[in-house]
């Protein structure tokens, strides 16, 4: 089950676990064109028991005008046309991939002004492997971050 977090009380306890951008304040993540989503096991599953208690994964998204290459660029939210996935972490194997796919699908269905789905990823081999394996294509590398794009047409 995908849940959009609306309050500081919901976001604050999770920020301490952010391995990519732990210094970004919790309140900043849910203001001015930025959102936080959490993936949980479906608590109402009839066939399978709930296997994971608590959040399985978290993703933070900024809706920006163009592609961000720095954290500062994530504040350019006045005329958004791009969903920037700027941090994702998981507590359960496979949940990172699942939350990226589910949030991209949700945004595609609910925000028609968003035409691109791009990451603001750290310059690590792990980030590169994660996004390439999930179907993203490499866009560019900056001095502090790199971008990968999930093509809109391929998002379910």
What do the predicted segments below correspond to?
Residues 143-156:
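C-terminal "cap" of GNAT-fold acetyltransferases
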Residues 1-3, 110, 154-156:
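Short, Lys/Arg-enriched, disordered terminal segments
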Residues 27-63:
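Conserved beta-hairpin
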Residues 51-55, 59-83:
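Conserved acyl-donor/pantetheine-binding loop and adjacent beta-alpha core of acyl/acetyltransferases
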Residues 1-31, 38:
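Short amphipathic alpha-helix that is part of the acyltransferase structural core
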Residues 71-135, 143:
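Acyl-donor binding region in acyl/amide transferases
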Residues 44, 66, 124-125:
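Short, solvent-exposed loop/turn segments at secondary-structure junctions
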